[in-house]
Amino acid sequence: MSDQSAAAKVVVVGSINADMRVGVERFPGPGETLAGGKATLTPGGKGANQALAAARCGVRVEMVGAVGKDPTADTALSLLSECVGLGGVVRRDILTGTAIVMVADSGENSIIVISAANGTVDSASVRAQAERVESANIVVCQGEIPSDGIAEAARRGSGFVVNFAPVIDVDSDVIRMADPLVVNEHEAALVAAALGSTTPHLEDDPDVALRELLGLGCRSVVITLGSAGCIVGGPEGFDSVAAARVEAVDTVGAGDAFVGALAAELARGRTLLKGCRFAPAVATATVTKPGAQASYPSTAEVEDIRRGEHA
């Protein structure tokens, strides 16, 4: 690990889940019952996914969140415990957050999230971990914890990255504190509307959506485009980054891998544009394997990706 990586620290304030994954030929329609294929219980949650991805990118990572005292908590923390500091994770007398993930034969996924313990990661919980949060170079949040918890993390983080997935009702000042705001094209349109935009159909034109969000006061914006890569804009300028073409096996967790890799690069002091040229390669590596956290490249594999980016 380089001196720069050793000094870099990411704190993720967010969700920790156990994912019930079920393979299906296709997604059921309304009122339809389908037979599922193989079912597995694996660690997940957007916050946990992003924390693991950042740690695999070679920086120090700590997690602030909550799990239950039920057996699925051990599953939820199983991979994080290998490389992420869990001193900020509280066990509560409530169920561990759970996601029910349907993965179609096409590789696409559909997800239902049950917040459970994640719903307790509020402003009081974040204040209780104030020293931990304030020690980070980059603090990362997502939309799977209460909005007041996100706001508290934003106020305490020296560098704040928020991935509004899903988009929840958060004070507009908190959105404008993000540097960057990371969203997909559909989330970009929803966030723009929340900030007062009246421009229609922004989800159909990510470039327009990006400039709209910047015009509404966002410091910097990254819009992820799935297999097409991402676009980024802010004070440094604008860029469009293509993702390598691969045959997707499972897209679950790819967006979280992107956010984690980007956070790690920013914590190292890389510019946003440079981070956005690296993160899509990490995300692309995940879709070639099944699972979310299970598909994330190891630290050694990330270094191979990094060398390829600089070749």
Predicted features by range, described:
Residues 130-134, 175-176, 215:
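A short, aliphatic-rich alpha-helical micro-motif
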Residues 1-10, 169, 193-195, 199-311:
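Conserved phosphate-binding/catalytic region of the ribokinase-like
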Residues 66, 88-91, 101-138, 143:
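Conserved phosphate-binding/catalytic loop of the ribokinase/pfkB sugar-kinase fold
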Residues 137-208, 228-230:
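Conserved beta-alpha-beta core of the PfkB/ribokinase-like small-molecule kinase fold
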Residues 79-93:
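A glycine-rich helix N-cap at a beta->alpha junction
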Residues 52, 98-102, 110-111, 223, ...:
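Short beta-strand scaffold segments in enzyme catalytic cores
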Residues 1-64, 71-75, 248-249:
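Glycine-rich phosphate/adenosyl-contacting loop at the front of the ribokinase-like
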Residues 82-83, 119-124, 160-167, 241-242:
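Short gly/ser/thr-rich secondary-structure transition/capping motifs
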